[in-house]
């Protein structure tokens, strides 16, 4: 699938002040009618413990280049994670099938974001990672199957949060970028369910308590202060 990029200008909402106290208010919509609420499954809303704070949304609109660069990084990391699981767990046919499909899809999205960046004059540069993924992975247990269960739960949370943030951004972005993000929500909206399915497959015991633990940690990371904007950062410090 190819996307027409247009004139290469990302809409940035004007701000009368850089006072961070203003970031708790709703940014002004971009003027088109595009949304993605109809594409997000209800199960995704129920899975996440909190919505993306308005302060992060305003922060994202103030950092359009970083948003795209880190988005590309996220797609590449998602593909890398899927490939790593493919190599490590060759004895699980369902995991191989799900992760193979996911890796191809994430790499396609990576290519699309990079093409979009090039069309808009955004140079791909190295960004330090946010504390988000590492803040979740620090709780990984050491041995399988417990470790794999944790990895899969974390994968589910990252996928769910990514789609939720795409949907949050859509009304405030220029129309062509909003259309692109809407296609991502449509194609990736249920990836988190695949991760949870695989996690539950690893044991006959309930993993609900472990899921609840990571959901709570994820919400803490999303709502706590960060000094650098990233796609999965918390609120501005």
Locations of the language-model features?
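Extreme N-terminal basic, low-complexity initiation segments
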Residues: 1-6
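Non-heme di-metal
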Residues: 11-14, 18, 23-237
């Amino acid at each position: 699938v190819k996307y027409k990029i247009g004139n290469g200008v990302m809409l940035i909402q004007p701000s009368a002040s850089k006072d961070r106290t203003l970031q708790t208010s709703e940014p002004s919509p971009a003027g088109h009618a595009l949304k993605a609420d109809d594409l997000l499954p209800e199960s995704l809303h129920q899975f996440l413990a909190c919505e993306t704070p308005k302060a992060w949304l305003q922060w994202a609109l103030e950092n359009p280049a970083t948003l795209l660069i880190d988005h590309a990084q996220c797609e590449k990391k998602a593909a890398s994670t899927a490939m790593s699981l493919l190599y490590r767990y060759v004895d699980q046919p369902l995991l191989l099938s799900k992760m193979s499909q996911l890796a191809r899809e994430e790499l396609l999205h990576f290519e699309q974001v990079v093409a979009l960046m090039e069309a808009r004059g955004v140079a791909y540069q190295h960004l330090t990672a946010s504390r988000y993924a590492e803040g979740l992975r620090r709780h990984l247990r050491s041995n399988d199957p417990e470790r794999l269960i944790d990895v899969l739960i974390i994968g589910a949370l990252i996928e769910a949060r990514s789609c939720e943030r795409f949907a949050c951004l859509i009304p405030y972005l220029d129309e062509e970028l909003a259309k692109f993000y809407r296609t991502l929500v449509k194609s990736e909206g249920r990836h988190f369910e695949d991760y949870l399915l695989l996690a539950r497959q690893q044991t006959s015991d309930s993993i609900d308590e472990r899921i609840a633990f990571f959901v709570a940690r994820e919400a803490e990371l999303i709502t706590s202060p960060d000094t650098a904007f990233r796609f999965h950062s918390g609120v501005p410090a």
